[in-house]
Amino acid sequence: MILQLVRFYPFGAFVVFTALSSYLALQPLPSSVPLIAFLSILRLETTLVIHRPWTFVRLVAIWAAIFIGCFFSFVGLRFGSPEAPVVTASYAVIFSLLGLFIVVLAAYCGSNNFVFPALWATWWLVIAQMSPVGRLGAWSPLIGDDTYSWLRPHVSDFGIDWIVGASAEVLSCFVTWHVLGFNQRHQNDDGNERRDHRNEEGDLQTERVDSGRVKFLLFILIALSFPSSLTELLPEPLHEDNRHDVGVSCVLPDLSGPRTSFDAFMNETAIVAGRAHVALWPEDAVFFETEQDKETGLIKAQELSHQYGIFIGVSFLEPLLEEGEDRGKRRSGTVLVGKDGVMAEYYGRHPAPFSKRVPERSLPGIVNITLGRKNTKHFWEMRLSASIGLDFAHPYSHFDAKPQLILGPARTDHRKMAQVMMEMARHRAQELRTTILWCDGSDSGLSGLVGSGHTRKQVGPGTWVERMVARIPSEEEWTLYELYGAFFGLLCAWAPIVLPMIPLPDIRITFPDPKPRRANVAGRLNWLLRRKRPQRDVRTGTLVEI
């Protein structure tokens, strides 16, 4: 029944399928399988539409279907703003246009099956670099990509997007040939293969087919899935040479009492100081109204650090009091405090839209901290860095050294957004092959250790302590992504498209005539043994060969 509707009313059926599949695929936490199915429908639909009458009207109908599905998938989120419906509608309009544009562009770029995956991955790489929310909103899977997650340290999310585009290309070709019945194949005069089918108006359409590229693309997808079965994403063993266990804590006190937030965080930090080496406060844990309040609070944190030997990540919100265009705005920051005072300061580089906060322009740095216990007189150093909130939605790889631990204070307004941001942090940890201490301070937030095989998660408030393993000294094994960024992924994606287009010079190599072949001695001997001996003619007396 469904196939008959598709054959007799293909455009209407495709619009309905587009709306339903976009709702399932463009959820706040996109999964790979629904996204591939939705993208294959969109790829097939746009390829059939662009060569027919009323192309623009048909594309507007497709965009409307995507917008409806995208809007209802995000309608429950608040985005940290009271103008929730307006923000949701704006998000749906922008990203539905961005996604549809690149699919339509690929439909006009010919029949090379490698073009669409390359365009798809490159497009979302550019959007992530330009968007104020990074990869939030990108049509890219956040879950369900474990089979190809080993690619992320080498080509980042660019490789996962290429896998999604290639899978959608293969699936759309399979549906076109074997489900919809557009598989009447003939040979052109030049020997190339073509496929004939009729459109809705009854006009015969001829489309070139190259099933060899599709099969090769399918072979690449299958081959790239094998390495995941050979690797295990597990934490490092605790008791091995050159490894030390480090206690990390996310401080999430109960703020319903009469105490101020700063005192509550200080008391909770003192409770876990005997078990943790590093304690992190969530994003905007305290508010410093003046510079004097900030200095006083950091001095108290330094005294606590000196007393217990713990490093404290104090996350705060402060107003900008300097004269200028940013006066009156705020900024989020995290200060790493040790026994000797402030060791490093980090400020949010990508604040949430409509939050009226000032972004930091400089990249996060790395600080070396000395860990150990006084009673054992055994100390070691560990490299540490930090980023705040939406910074983890933006890929970054340019560190002078590999950090062994990244502090990740955050604060989200919805359970789904908490899951999204924690998955973003997991992707950044996989790219850098490091561990992130994720600490979300909202009532419905998630916190835990992500990366390096860690899977600990906690929902809502409640201070916790977890042990992680650090290699001492750290192994400086730089990945391709850390060395070259997205360049290696771009090279691999576009090489099958660009290389066949390069004209090669007509070079003819002339070889000298080969030497005369030596006699086949074995063959001659075999002939001599098998031939019959000559006999003498009795009449003439001569030898005769028989």
Locations of the language-model features?
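Membrane-embedded alpha-helical bundles of multi-pass enzymes
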Residues: 2-233, 414-415, 425-428, 432, ...
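Active-site beta-loop-alpha substructure in enzyme catalytic cores
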Residues: 124, 266-280, 358-432
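Soluble catalytic regions of membrane-associated enzymes that act on cell-envelope
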Residues: 209, 226-357, 372-378, 390
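Structural detector of well-ordered beta-strand residues that form the stable sheet scaffold
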Residues: 311-313, 385, 437
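Short beta-strand scaffold segments in enzyme catalytic cores
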Residues: 314-316, 332-336, 365, 443-452, ...
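Residue-level detector of high-confidence beta-strand sites
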Residues: 342-348, 408, 455-461
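A short, polar/charged loop-to-alpha-helix boundary motif
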Residues: 350-363, 459-475
